[in-house]
Amino acid sequence: MTIISTLRRFIPPYKWYVVLNLFFNIVSTILSLFSFATLIPVLQLLFGLATIDGVYTPLEQVQGLEELLVALKNNFYFMLQSQMELRGPSYVLLLLGIGLVVLTGLKCLTIWLANYFMVPLRTGVLRDLRESLYKKVVSLPIGFFTEERKGDVMSRMTNDVNEVEASIMSTLDMLFKDPVMILIYLVTLFCVSWQLTLFVLLLLPVAGLLIGRIGRTLKRASTKGQEQNAEILTQIEETLGGLRVVKAFNAEQKLIHRFQLLINATRRTFNRINRRYYLAHPVSEFLGTTLIAILLWFGGLLILSDNSAIDAATFIYYIVIFYSIIGPAKDLSKATYGIRRGMASLERIDKILETESNVIEAKTPKQVVDFQSMIRFENVSFAYQTDRPVLQDVNLDIHKGQTVALVGQSGSGKTTMADLLPRFYDPQSGCITIDGVDIREVKTHDLRALMGNVNQEAILFNDTFYNNITFGVEHATMEQVRQAARIANADDFIMATPDQYETTIGDRGSRLSGGQRQRISIARAILKNPPILILDEATSALDTESEKLVQEALENLMRDRTTIVVAHRLSTVRNADLICVLHEGRIVERGTHDELMAQNGYYRRLVEMQEK
């Protein structure tokens, strides 16, 4: 990935800011040249290096750029000569000083305006990058996150984006300004003395090769550094998520030691990165000063030998302009180094942005607004890894209004089967239909709008009770929310909190008990009032009393509604219309509780094991 391709991705929406920035940078550079040009007559007056002599030339008689530049110079000198004859050299010096101040003031104004228009470009590009990354992460299928470490994804969304901001966005102004300044200065140097400029250009490739070599090693080290940052964030996330287990097993010192190894390795990597990064300024300054020394030697020899086409004052002007290139060259070198650091982070971000979803939307989706008759699993097979099938040739019809329970040992494929219905994953073979329509031909948003989901682990947000219950449901009234909470046996404990439904429940509902969190999750599904319910171990976190109350409420809710229940506790699904027993990815038994008990097979053994 090149710098140009990176800019082409993000800059187009802000092209007018770029145009204005370039315009004011060009103006400021030209004003710098004019302010430098005032030095020539000053030197000539103060040190008698030459006489100020000029002949007035009407501009309408001028043809071509070269004649125009000569005419402007002659007219400027003619004006100075006239003022010297009228008022003397001291007045001309004062006039030149005032002109220098005015030109410098205008230059400073244009520099500020150039930066003024760069600010919305920088912040806008960064906002667009964050928005694109967040949208992509939200739209990716769940399967992506089973293969990627959560800490690594978080690192790319935080550390890598921050690195892009610090290294690429902060140097965009240099990237636009410095090449313009260097180009204008070089053109001016050619106009002043093309011989000296050609001599200088012969020496530049050596400097470019040295700076480029440092930059390439910097990018490789930056990639490694960001990967190590991701490992640190992963361990922090795992530690905070499993702190109860860490303390229970006295594993604090083990984790501390592992963390120390990580941060020490990261420190060493970033030591190398920053040491190379800080080479940019001294190396470019040393090379620039070396070039000036060579230039002084070469140009001085020409002037002393009377073989030069320029006089001493013009040579000093040439040196001043050339020295002015060193500043932009150093900044450009530093910006290039910074961008190489940022490119490493941008490539890590692109791995997410360029990830293709394996849950693909239909190009011409079919309209499904309600559930009418039947859900069908037809020869469905699925595997997270190709050599380890989770579901094999599953066939199942679920009629509208039925409650179907999926039971079996851990790893038998119960939850996976439930996850296929809302297209968290797509089966490798076979199909799932709703009312005869393949769910892959339905818009994912419309498909999931038909379903309510309550997971084994209650997923709550650091927000109020009200906002957690209404999550994904718009325009719900407080009475509707309270009614859903009552059905889920949650209204009483919510009303007992200080701010009732406006009480914040903490990160992932940390201020609530496990049973309370689950009941809030159930209330959310009840409020959505979908035609299809998916209950994945929905009552497993409840105490006996709460489970009984919520189970009764869920049974009332499930009446005349299609429900798929994933359960380990078989006592909660005895009243299901159909119980499917899964074993090693296949439905090995199906029927009601009484029918399955009479078969004396897998289901009966599971029931007897739990009753013991």
Model-derived regions, located:
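Membrane-integrated ABC transporters
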Residues: M1-L39, L45-L100, L106, A114-M118, ...
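An intracellular "coupling" helix at the cytosolic face of ABC transporter transmembrane type-1 domains
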Residues: P12-K15, I142-G143, N159-I168, L172, ...
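Transmembrane helices of ABC transporter permease
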Residues: Y17-V27, D173-K224, W297-I310, G327
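Hydrophobic alpha-helical transmembrane bundles that constitute the permease/transmembrane domains
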Residues: I26-F34, V101-W112, V164-S167, T171-L183, ...
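Juxtamembrane helix-loop junctions of ABC transporter transmembrane domains
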Residues: S32-I40, G48-T51, L94, G99-K150, ...
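Hydrophobic/aromatic residues within transmembrane alpha-helices of membrane transport systems
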Residues: L43, V102, L133, V137, ...
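Helix-loop-helix
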Residues: T188-L202, R276-L346
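ABC-type nucleotide-binding domain
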Residues: E361-A362, V368-K612
